[in-house]
Amino acid sequence: MTDNQEIKPKKLTLGNSKLSLNKSFDSLTGAQSFVNAKSKTLVEVRKSSIGSTTTISLNKERNNLDQTVIDANKEEFNRRLSILKKAAEQSKLNDPSQISTLSKLASINQSTNLKIETLETDKEVAQKRQNITENKVEVSAKIVQGDEDILSQIYKKKAETFVKSPLVGMRTRYSIESEKESDKTAESKVVVQKIKLEEPKKFKKVDLFNMLSDDESGSGRTRTRSLASIKRAREKEKRKLVLQAPEKVYREVTIPEVIGVGDLANAMSERVADVIKELMNLGILANASQVIDADTAELVATNLGHKVKRVQESDVENVLISDDKVEDLRTRAPVVTVMGHVDHGKTSLLDALKSTDIAAGEIGGITQHIGAYRVTLADGRAITFIDTPGHEAFSEMRSRGTKVTDIAIIVVAADDGIKTQTVEAINHAKVAGVPIIIAINKIDKPNIDIERVKNELYIHEIIGEEAGGDVMVIPISALKKINLDKLEEAILLIAEMQDLKASPFGSAAGVVIESKIEKGRGTLTTILVQRGTLKNGDIIIAGTSYGKVKKMTNDKGLEIAEATPSVPVEIQGLNEVPFAGVKFNVVQNEKQAKDIAEYRMRLAKEKKISIAPRSSLEDLFLKASGNSKIKELPLIIKGDVHGSVEAILGSLLKLPSDEIKLRILHSGVGPITESDISLAHASSAIIVGFNVRAGVNALTAAEKAKIDIRYYSIIYNLIDDVKAIMSGMLDPIVREQYIGSVEIRRVFNVTKVGKIAGSYVTKGIIKKGADVRLLRDNIVIHEGKLKTLKRFKDEVKEVREGYECGIAFENYEDIRENDVVEVFELIQEQRQL
C-alpha cells in the first residue's frame, strides 16, 4: 500500500481459518502475518510458531495522520493486550506463550468493540470438562489499581471485550459495563460469565496455514476436500477460461501459386470451418482437401486479418542453388564417357583399363545399361569412366552420358569402320560440346585399313591432329593392350588443359547415372557426385524421388562413408526409383525434400494434362476419317534398371503403324508383381520382363488368369517379338489374282434355273465359285461369284482354255451375248511392319 492510499475500516479473520485481508507466510522465520486497518492506521499482529510470542506493531498513520492519534491508538492497543494477560492470570494460566492461535472473528472497530477469541488445545478441553458443574457461573474479577485507568479509557471508547480462557477450556466473557456520565467517571465492574463449551461441529478445510499451524487443539482439526468439491472447483476454473476469450494473433502468411484449404487454415492458425465460410462468402464451395489459387487464398487471408506474402511455387527449389567459392575449388578427376557402335570393343577397352573382366558378364556381348567405374593410374591420378550401350535402342542413354562427361572417347573398329551408332555418338558429343578422342580399336586383326577409317571420319568433320585438326586419333588394341598408355596420357592431357575443378565442401550435388530395384536391398541408385561431399545420412532429392542415404558402395562393391567430386557411388535409401539423368541435391531435412518432390509432381501432372487433349483430337480425327477400327496392343513393361526400361519404351514407340496403337499400361523397375498380373488381367495385356522374373505368387496368379508373360535378356529380341505381334494384328493384304477370261456366245432360259450363258474359255481357266467380273463394252457392270459351271449336262469344278461351258451368276441374270467375263481369285498376304 502507498502512503496516499485511502484505507477503509475492514474486518479481519485471525487464526487458522479464512483470512479476509492481506496474508503472508515467511518460510524462513515460520511466522504468519495478518494485517488489518483500524481507522487510518495499519495494525500488524504477528504470531511466531517458533518462539510462541505475540507482538503488536503500529505503522505510521496514513494520509499524514497526527502523531498524537498514533500514540493514542498504540496506547489503547497495549491496554487491551494487558487485559488479555490479566484474564489469563485469573484463569491460572502461568504460561501465556502457549496461546496458540486466535480464531474466529476479531473485529477491531474504530469506535466501539474489540472482540478476540482464542482456540483451545485438546488438553484444555479435557480440563474444561472436569471443571464444568454449572451451565452459568458468574465470576467477579478483581481489578488491580493500575487497571482503573484502563477501564476509564475503555469506557470512553465503549468497548466490550470477550476473552476465552485457553487453560480452563471454558468460554469466559468479561463484560465491562459502565454508565456514561458527562462530568464524572463511574465505577466499572467486570462480570465474568462461564459459558458451556461448544465443541467444534465442523472440520475446517485444509489450507496452507492450517497445515503449517502448531495448533493441536480439537478446534484446529481439518478435513480433506471431497472429490465433488474438487470437481466443482475445476469446473469453475474452466468456466473462467471459457469466458476469457484468447486474443487473436494475426500472422504473415506465405501463399504459393496453389494451396490447399486445409494448408491455408494451418498457415493462419484458423479453423478450417472459418476458411470454408470465407470461401462461401466469395461464392466458392470447397472442402478441406480442395486446392485454391493464390488470388483466392490472398482474399481469404486478408478478410481474416492476416498479412499475405506471395511467393512463386518454384521458389522451393531456390535452396538447391548455391555458388562455390573460388578459394574452395580443388582439382578433380576427369569423367570420360566411352561410346561407339555395338561390338566395337567399348567394354573390352574398359576391361583392359581396369584389368577386370567386365565383358564376360554382359549378356549377348553388349552393354545393357550404363556402368560407372573409377580407375586409379600408376602415378596416383584417377579417371572416372562411364560405359554407355552401343545398341541403337540406347540412344537416350548415350545422350545422357555425354551430358555428364568431360571427355568423350568414341571407339571405332578398324575392321568395321564408321557405323550408325558411331555417327550418333559423334553428334551427341558435338551437341554436348565435349572434347573427342577417337580410339581405333582391333588394330591387332589382319587386313585392317586405319587410313580408310580416318577418311570416313573426315566425312563427319572429325579431323585428326596429324591432318591439322584438333581431334586426337589413337590406334589401340583392347585385347592385346596396345597403346593404352597413350590413350591415358591423352585423357590426362585434355583434362589438364580444361583445368577441371570442383569444391569438395558444402552440400553434395550431381547426376543420377542409373537406378534399379533389388530384392532385399530396395532402391539402388548409381550417382556421380559433381560438387560437394556426399555422406551417409544425407537427405537427397532426385527428381520426384527423395530419401536418406542409408548406405554407399563404390564401383568395387566396398562400403564407403563419403564421396567427393567425380566419384561414382551406388546408394540405397530413396523412396522410389528416380529417372536416370536427373540431377540430385542434398537438402537440409526430409520436409524440404518432400516439398520439392510434390512441386515437381504437380508440374509433371499439369504437363500431362496439357498434352492429353492433343491425343483426344487425334482420336477424333481418326474416327471422322472412317478409320475408327484401330486395334490396340496393351503392354506392361518391367525391367531391371531404369535406363533399360527407357530404351525399350523409346524403341517400341518408334514402331510405325497407323492401324495398331501400342498402349503402355505400366512401366517400371523391379520384378513382376501380383499387381502387374491384376492389371494385365483387367486389360488383356501382355507382360514383358527384361532381366526380371515374376515371383511365385505372381506366377500362380498369372497361370490362373492365363496371362502371357514373356522374358527377355537382349533388347533387340524383345523389340523384334513385339513387332511380330503387332504385325500379326494387322489386317492382311487382299490381292486379286487373274486366272482366266470367258466369252458369252449364247444365252439360254432354263426352267427353275434361270438364264444360262453358253460360253467359251478364251484364256486361262475358270473355276466354280470363283470371283467374276462382267464387262460389257469394256465397262464393268457386275462383280460377284460364279454359281454354276457345267460341261454339257455335268457339273464340273473347272474348265480350261479352249473348251466350251455353261455358266450362271449368283443373284444376277442380266447377261447378253458378246459379254466378257473375267475370272479371278482373292489372295490374302500377311503384312509386316
UniProtKB/Swiss-Prot annotation:
Name of the featured protein: Translation initiation factor IF-2
Subcellular location, record wording: Cytoplasm
Span list, region G3: 387-390
Region (G2): 365-369
Annotated function: One of the essential components for the initiation of protein synthesis. Protects formylmethionyl-tRNA from spontaneous hydrolysis and promotes its binding to the 30S ribosomal subunits. Also involved in the hydrolysis of GTP during the formation of the 70S ribosomal complex.
Annotated keywords: Cytoplasm, GTP-binding, Initiation factor, Nucleotide-binding, Protein biosynthesis
Region (G1) location: 340-347
Family named by the database record: Belongs to the TRAFAC class translation factor GTPase superfamily. Classic translation factor GTPase family. IF-2 subfamily.
Domain of life: Bacteria
GO molecular-function term, one example from the UniProt record: GTP binding
Region (G4) residue spans: 441-444
Record bears the keyword Protein biosynthesis: yes
